[in-house]
């Protein structure tokens, strides 16, 4: 981590079984907030139907409780995974009593780790997971009278199932209208999407190392590397497939085009012009 580093921890507690997860993060940015949610849901073995966050800026844009306006990025993430966000009310201890009690407990039983030097965040997380696992075997769930671990194992069937792939955490999200050239603009670059999305509105997310593009129905349309030197990112696969009653399939490339055009424009390899001339002669 490069010396002593101040970290934040996300503590997620299931209301029924009191099972919990502690996820360490380097910041409170939206990117890390969503990544921490992903890791917490994985450890809990599912997704709660309702999530009640405190009124932190990464979750709530303004207001609190039922009158809160959620951050659009967090709201979009919740819709994609299917859970409802129900922020805490101001000065209402009953709304977050369980997790605050768990937070005090976490500080106590993880106190021994503060004097240990961890070179990687992953090592600290592994040590934390180990202590959490031991803790839930000893603590008793007040609802069931059994251990938190045993109560959680019974509760898992009531949680929403984890998707095959959790959403890639993102720090920027915008809506864009696809041009007639099947391109969308984002961060000074243009990205190609499947031709059937022409003139439709899509959702573009800037993730840690990629740009993810989704349709309005949540369908994943395209993935590109983020922040490339290339300003026009084309993927020839997006011109394949059948058209529909709204859009016809683009005219396929000819022999020369198929031989010269790169499948992914950002993976351009520099070649002498003589190589292209020789290629054209062979195909002529």
Where are these regions (language model features)?
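Protein C-terminal end segments and domain termini
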Residues: 207-284
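Active-site beta-loop-alpha junctions of metal-dependent nucleic acid enzymes
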Residues: 7, 22-50, 227-233
């Amino acid at each position: 981590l490069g010396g002593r580093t101040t970290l934040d921890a996300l503590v997620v507690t299931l209301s029924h079984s009191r099972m919990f997860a502690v996820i360490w993060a380097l910041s409170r940015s939206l990117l890390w907030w969503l990544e921490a949610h992903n890791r917490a849901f994985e450890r809990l073995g599912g997704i709660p139907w309702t999530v009640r966050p405190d009124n932190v800026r990464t979750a709530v844009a303004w207001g609190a409780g039922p009158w809160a306006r959620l951050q659009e990025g967090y709201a979009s993430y919740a819709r994609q995974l299917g859970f409802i966000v129900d922020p805490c009310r101001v000065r209402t201890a009953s709304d977050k009593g369980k997790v605050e009690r768990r937070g005090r407990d976490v500080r106590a039983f993880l106190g021994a780790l503060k004097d240990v030097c961890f070179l990687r965040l992953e090592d600290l997380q592994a040590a934390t997971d180990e202590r959490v696992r031991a803790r839930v075997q000893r603590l008793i769930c007040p609802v069931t009278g059994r251990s938190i671990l045993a109560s959680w194992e019974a509760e898992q069937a009531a949680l929403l199932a984890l998707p095959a792939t959790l959403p890639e955490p993102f720090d920027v999200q915008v809506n864009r209208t696809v041009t007639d050239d099947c391109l969308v603009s984002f961060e000074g670059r243009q990205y190609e999407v499947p031709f059937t999305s022409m003139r439709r509105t899509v959702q573009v997310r800037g993730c840690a190392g990629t740009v993810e593009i989704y349709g309005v129905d949540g369908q994943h349309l395209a993935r590109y590397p983020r922040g490339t030197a290339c300003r026009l990112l084309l993927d020839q696969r997006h011109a394949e497939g059948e058209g529909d009653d709204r859009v016809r399939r683009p005219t396929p490339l000819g022999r020369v085009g198929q031989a010269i055009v790169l499948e992914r424009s950002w993976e351009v390899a520099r070649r002498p012009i003589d190589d292209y001339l020789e290629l054209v002669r062979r195909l002529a």
